[in-house]
Regions:
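Short loop/turn elements that flank and shape the SAM/SAH-binding pocket of Class I
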Residues: 110
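N-terminal pre-Walker A segment at the start of P-loop NTPase domains
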Residues: 96-107
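Hydrophobic positions on the alpha1 helix immediately C-terminal to the Walker A/P-loop
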Residues: 136-137
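Conserved glycine(s) of the Walker
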Residues: 132-133
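Flexible phosphate-sensing "switch/lid" loops adjacent to ATP/NTP-binding sites
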Residues: 1-88, 93-94, 114-124, 143-301
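Residues at the beta-strand->loop junction immediately N-terminal to the Walker
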Residues: 126-128
Length: 301
């Protein structure tokens, strides 16, 4: 599938699509991103054998086409001024949300892998970056879910996590200061998120590590899959997957919550890959609404 615009002369677009066909690509459809300056009156319904889809909002048009056709990839043949940086990222976010790569002349976005690994329902708590309150929200959710009989297990990944996934029975261990000092003396990260989750939520937790973080939240290396396998052996009824920074746990989640600090720059939420995280979200929780981090007016905005 391709994304085109009306800023290009139709013969140029048609020639580009013909060249793709000669190279062995099958173009199922073209989505018009906007622009009518160089289109004939009444628009264009097709370029050769490639039908053109258009509508009021190209994001909706693209989404409908992706769901219907399930292409292998989306190739962006548009350009400024029809697609500026923000609008292009919005279209890329739609494609990634549908699990389809989005690429252009000198870039390619690939949807982060999130396979189904858990034996129980999963809740992901992800954020727009570091210090957003993900661990506090995960602990809060775990406490309340545990109080209502759901027997949650929290899996937290971090840049300082253990080499092998570690189980901490927060429901059994006191985790007093001497316990934390013992962890530190043993060379372990006693302030890791999974330790904090176990101490504050009093539920079993699994600590994992990850390295690297992509624009869409993918991770380069992690032992989260092994951590989920460890969690599958516990008598839990729900697995909470806690993100790290802006990185997303590389595991399928049945429900996803996005933690957004009130003081976040608008561009981090509406631009770049912020729209992708918003598409993943079943709910959004705004944190740090008080001064000096935020304000009531900023939170409402």
């Amino acid at each position: 599938m391709v994304v085109i615009d009306g800023e290009h002369y139709p013969p140029v677009v048609e020639a580009a699509l013909a060249g793709m066909a000669e190279d062995g690509h099958e173009v199922a459809s073209a989505v018009l991103a906007g622009g009518v300056e160089k289109l004939p009156r009444g628009g264009v319904n097709a370029y050769g054998d490639v039908p053109v889809r258009a509508g009021a909002d190209p994001r909706d048009v693209l989404d409908e086409a992706l769901v219907e056709l399930r292409p292998d990839a989306v190739l962006d043949l548009s350009d400024e001024p029809v697609l500026d940086y923000r609008r292009r990222h919005e279209l890329a976010a739609v494609a990634l949300y549908r699990g389809i790569p989005y690429e252009g002349t000198d870039f390619k976005f690939t949807p982060p892998s999130r396979p189904r690994l858990s034996d129980v329902p999963t809740l992901a708590i992800i954020g727009t970056g570091k210090r957003t309150g993900k661990t506090a929200v995960s602990g809060y959710a775990a406490r309340h879910l545990d109080a209502h009989g759901y027997r949650p297990v929290v899996l937290a990944m971090g840049r300082g996590g253990p080499a092998e996934p570690e189980l901490l029975r927060g429901d059994e261990v006191a985790l007093e200061p001497r316990d934390l000092l013992a962890l530190a003396d043993a060379g372990r990260h006693a302030a890791s998120d999974y330790v904090e989750d176990a101490m504050l939520a009093r539920v079993p937790t699994v600590g994992c590590r990850r390295c690297g973080g992509g624009l869409a939240g993918g991770v380069s290396i992690s032992n989260v899959a092994e951590g989920v396998e460890l969690a599958n052996g516990l008598p839990g009824g729900l697995l909470i997957l806690e993100g790290s920074g802006s990185a997303i746990p590389p595991v399928h989640a049945d429900v996803t919550g996005v933690v957004v600090p009130a003081g976040i720059r608008e561009e981090y939420l509406a631009g770049y890959m912020g729209p992708y995280r918003m598409l993943l979200a079943d709910f959004v929780l705004v944190t740090m609404c008080e001064e000096p981090f935020g304000s009531p007016s900023r939170s409402r905005q």
